[in-house]
């Protein structure tokens, strides 16, 4: 009986080991190394799906949790040095039912060699009833934190990469799931759009979907759709 139990336990061990191996094989791997030393960074630039030029603005609207939500993204005429890299400041202003819920100042730089846009962190003000309540989600690519990739200069379906690399604070990552989508919003109709799925190991069950149009940028963020774009006057 003892020998039989030993064989049973051994079989279970092998089974668990094989399952673990199969699980590891199926786990998605996201790139977190981008050879930034080969980049000459600029605070302005653009690629097919992202415009990093002062004054450029996107406005998206829609309903989230049955509440009217508005997101205004503006490339500011401001820069900020993060580490030894001068970055461009991009403000995101989100409101729900006309009340501001979040204002973030995001720091991006353009790699002239690859046309990729890299993300160097953000400062965040979260609001409730018109008052700042916390700065949750804020991080900078300094110390143990590293810059992430916001938009590849040559995106390919299946490419997986980290957008934020701040362990325990911000670890958003993206997978390009399609290039060639068609979408229509009140601002226009577009073809050959880029679709990505965003996840984070900090909240494994959460998923978000975004779409980018050639020559425009972000046109869909969850339930929010582009209603206005161009250079703000």
Question: Where do the PLM segments sit?
Answer:
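Bacterial N-terminal signal peptides that target proteins for export
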Residues: 1-7
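Short, linear, compositionally biased motifs with a strong N-terminal bias
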Residues: 12-13
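C-terminal motif of bacterial Sec signal peptides marking the signal peptidase cleavage site
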Residues: 16-18
């Amino acid at each position: 009986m003892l020998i039989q139990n030993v064989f049973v336990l051994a079989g279970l061990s092998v089974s668990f080991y094989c399952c673990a191996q199969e699980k590891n094989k199926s786990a998605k791997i996201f790139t977190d190394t981008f050879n930034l030393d080969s980049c000459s960074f600029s605070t302005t630039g653009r690629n097919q799906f992202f415009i990093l030029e002062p004054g450029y603005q996107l406005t998206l609207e829609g309903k989230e949790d049955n509440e009217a939500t508005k997101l205004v993204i503006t490339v500011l005429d401001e820069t900020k040095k993060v580490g030894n890299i001068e970055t461009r400041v991009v403000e995101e202003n989100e409101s729900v039912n006309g009340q501001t819920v979040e204002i973030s100042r995001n720091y991006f730089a353009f790699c002239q060699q690859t046309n990729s846009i890299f993300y160097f962190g953000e400062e965040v003000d979260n609001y409730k009833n018109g008052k700042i309540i916390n700065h949750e989600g804020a991080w900078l690519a300094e110390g143990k934190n590293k810059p992430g990739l916001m938009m590849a200069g040559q995106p390919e379906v299946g490419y997986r990469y980290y957008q934020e690399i701040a362990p325990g604070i911000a670890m958003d990552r993206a997978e390009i799931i399609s290039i060639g989508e068609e979408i229509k919003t009140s601002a226009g109709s577009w073809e050959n759009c880029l679709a990505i799925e965003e996840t984070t190991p900090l909240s494994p069950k959460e998923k978000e979907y975004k779409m980018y149009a050639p020559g425009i940028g972000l046109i869909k963020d969850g339930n929010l759709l582009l209603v206005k774009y161009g250079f703000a006057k």
